[in-house]
Amino acid sequence: PAPRGTPQIEVTFEVDANGILNVKAEDKGTGKSEKITITNDKGRLSQEEIERMVREAEEFAEEDKKVKERIDARNGLETYVYNMKNQINDKDKLADKLESDEKEKIETAVKEALEWLDDNQSAEKEDYEEKLKEVEAVCNPIITAVYQRSGGASGGSSSSEEDGHDEL
């Protein structure tokens, strides 16, 4: 209870799902009430702004896809080139199995590809793919020949051993 002469006012606050605030004040003594609704439009996006942003996202989706494809193509080329570089220098891989002229051809192709990558930072997807084909055209036949030689050598020795067993 408030001292005599002090009005008793009941204030009710309600916030709905849209963030709209409804305030109701009622004077208990007179029964008179007032109501006000407060909306906070500042900082909120209008429907037009939302639609514009969706349109822009759709417009840029195609461009983003092209950029991703370009980056993937560049990464594919870089990965192949660095794998070749590692294989020809790693004794556990191809370093000991390559002839000097084969190693030189691969080293030259790798060096040229790395220089090309440095000089063509913003090349198109097709350019990266074309360069990858060029490097593969040099490296793959050599790698295939090395594997055939090493596979053929072990196959030859096993057939010799079998022949040896037949002779015994």
Swiss-Prot record:
GO-annotated molecular function: ATP binding; ATP-dependent protein folding chaperone
Cited Gene3D superfamilies: 1.20.1270.10, Substrate Binding Domain Of DNAk, Chain A, domain 1 (2.60.34.10)
Motif (Prevents secretion from ER): 165-168
Major subcellular location class: endoplasmic reticulum
UniProt KW keywords: ATP-binding, Endoplasmic reticulum, Glycoprotein, Nucleotide-binding
GO CC term, one of those recorded: endoplasmic reticulum lumen
Localization (cell): Endoplasmic reticulum lumen
Cited Pfam families: HSP70
Glycosylation sites: 120
Region of interest called Disordered, as start-end residue ranges on this chain: 148-168
Domain of life of the organism encoding this protein: Eukaryota
Keyword Zinc: no
Function statement: Probably plays a role in facilitating the assembly of multimeric protein complexes inside the ER.
Family assignment from sequence similarity: Belongs to the heat shock protein 70 family.
Protein name as it appears in the record: Luminal-binding protein 3
Protein's organism: Nicotiana tabacum
